[in-house]
Amino acid sequence: AVGLHLSGVLTAAEAFKGFVDSNVILFIAMFIIGAAFFETGVAVDVGNVVNKFAKNETILIIAIMMLTGIMSGFLSNTGTAAVMIPVVIGICKKGGFNQTKFLMPIVFAAAMGGNISMIGSPGNMIANSNLQEAGLGSFSFFAYGEVGLPMLIVGTLFYAFIGKRF
């Protein structure tokens, strides 16, 4: 942005417009919250609770995917996956499960869960910002959830009972 401004391609307002966009600030804040979740030990506590109830592979897949998906609805998809990977590896080691079977479900659930709320996925925020700039209104915070939550539930059940075989 600085180079484009100094070379005269963009005005200062155009070059730095993205840095003051509320979506950019919100996106940065989500990464901070995700890091705090891990640093405070909440991630480990969640892993211990999941480990207590997950007695077989199918239940563990459902628990991991639902937890990841719900977290992803309110935090960054990438940040959620990054936080959940070490948690799931720890759960698998503690429970004697093969960790390679549980890493892809994290990514799937984070992607699906991102559609629960406005802040779950950067694409949701960008679409909303574009609607507002065009003067077409905006989505409510949970507008995406009408499709996103059922998609997370159905996707989780599909993966737990059918998809894990492939």
Regions found by a protein language model. Give the residues of each.
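Hydrophobic residues within alpha-helical transmembrane segments
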Residues: 2, 63, 67, 105-108, ...
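Hydrophobic alpha-helical membrane segments of integral membrane proteins
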Residues: 1, 77-84, 104, 116-120
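Hydrophobic residues within membrane-embedded alpha-helical segments of Major Facilitator Superfamily
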Residues: 3-4, 37, 116, 151
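Membrane-embedded alpha-helical segments in integral membrane proteins
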Residues: 3-11, 129
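Juxtamembrane and boundary regions of transmembrane helices in multi-pass small-molecule transporters
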Residues: 94-166
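Alpha-helical transmembrane segments of multipass membrane proteins
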Residues: 2-6, 69-70, 111, 134
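Membrane-embedded alpha-helical segments and adjacent helix-loop junctions characteristic
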Residues: 9-95, 156, 160
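Small-residue-enriched core segments of transmembrane alpha-helices in multipass membrane transport
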Residues: 1-6, 87, 149
